[in-house]
Amino acid sequence: MNDKVTAVRDVWRYEQGEISKVEDRMVTEFPLTVILNGSEFVTLVCTPEHIEELVIGFLASEGVIRFQKEIKRFTIDESLGFVYVDLVHPETLDQKDYTKRVIGSCCGKGRHFYFQQDVKTAKTAVSQIKISPEACLALMKDMQQGSGTFQDTGGVHNAALCDTEKLLLMRTDIGRHNALDKLYGHCLLNGMSVRDKLIVFSGRISSEVLLKAAKIGVSIVISKSAPTELAIQMAEELNITAIGFVRNGSFNVYTHPERIRE
């Protein structure tokens, strides 16, 4: 499916006072419907690569599974845009938990979430890793330079799993949430520990993005964009260091600055 990630079309470009017809490369969108235990569960609009990682990461993020071994069958039908997933224990899945928006509290401390499953799956960060300011800047630069699809199209989000010195894994998608789910799915498929890892991200740190990072289990999120106020509240409560506006040699630390090495 990798050859379907981008497409070339004719466009009319205005430049230096003139309009000319040129070829331009753009990213594709792919609707992917997940059939879970024989019933339609969700349709994800995504960049069509690393599909297995995306679906497994999404299911884990939603609290449907915790481990890859909970999946009995996983089949991709590329021609129709369907993924069929059967769980080992389908009787444990309550469909109501994944279709109704509710507010729950975590550990009796009044934490507010969008879905009841967030209460079960968001993890309070426990890692005491520290990162230098220089590494924050370098990791962001490496991620931006490492995305060929972004360089070609300007139409995708990037997310990278890193240690405090280098990028370990990068995923790209038109949806910022999808890019994070692909990281999560890769970790589950490969038994990769995230305890002392961090995420570098191209999009803004919204509350949904912060929650996905918490579910993955990282303790530091670095973004070139701004966080929202609700995301900062959640980061404070979940013991996550939120770093934003990483650009031009500077950045802001919004929560838990003790993880920044002086």
Curated annotation (Swiss-Prot):
It comes from the Bacteria. It is found in: Cytoplasm. Its main location: cytoplasm. SUPFAM superfamilies: Cytidine deaminase-like. The active site is at residue 107. The keyword Lipid biosynthesis does not apply. Keywords: Cytoplasm, Molybdenum cofactor biosynthesis. One of its GO terms (cellular component) is cytoplasm. GO terms for biological process: Mo-molybdopterin cofactor biosynthetic process. Required for formate dehydrogenase (FDH) activity. Acts as a sulfur carrier protein that transfers sulfur from IscS to the molybdenum cofactor prior to its insertion into FDH. This is Sulfur carrier protein FdhD. It comes from Bacillus subtilis (strain 168).
